[in-house]
Amino acid sequence: MKILVLLDGSKWSYKAAINAIEIAQRKDAEIMIFSVIDRAETRSAAFYFCQQSNRCDLVNEHEEKIYRDLKKSIGEDLNELTLNMNRMNLKGSSKVVEGRREEEILKEFKSGDYTLVVMGAFGKRSNIRVGTLFNEISTSVNVPILILR
């Protein structure tokens, strides 16, 4: 069994990763914790901030701050999850890539021979795009997708 865990920096994806690690331990499975930093989404969030705050002069600075904060959050989560995996002597790895979220996830899925995908029920920007990632990948993924809250 090989598990692909989608991590986006949200508490939901972190909880999903913890559960995936427990599944991997019980099933003696290999685990890949995978994260995509999508610059288009950080730009979109910065533009949303610009519109709401009437501070479009700061849009570039805000985009960089969102990017740095997201990268830091994902890095911290990956460090904790990797420590847990190491303590349990699990086979696994992690990867962070930049690109279009859906494309990168599908590319990793197709290259990895995965038998299960695990993700959180809500993403980092759950108030804006609830459930969109599942809708975008579910038609292209031919294995079970476990969605955790």
Predicted segments with their positions:
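Absolute protein N-terminus
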Residues: 1-2, 149
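Structural beta-alpha unit
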Residues: 80-117
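Small/aliphatic-rich secondary-structure junction motif
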Residues: 2-61
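Gly/Ser-rich helix-loop-strand patches that form or flank binding pockets
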Residues: 107-149
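A short acidic, glycine-rich active-site loop
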Residues: 54-75
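Short glycine/serine/threonine/alanine-rich loop segments
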Residues: 29-30, 90, 143
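Generic structural signal for helix capping and beta-alpha/helix-loop junctions
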Residues: 40-41, 102-104, 126
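Conserved beta-strand positions in the Rossmann-like core of class I SAM-dependent methyltransferases
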Residues: 32, 93, 146
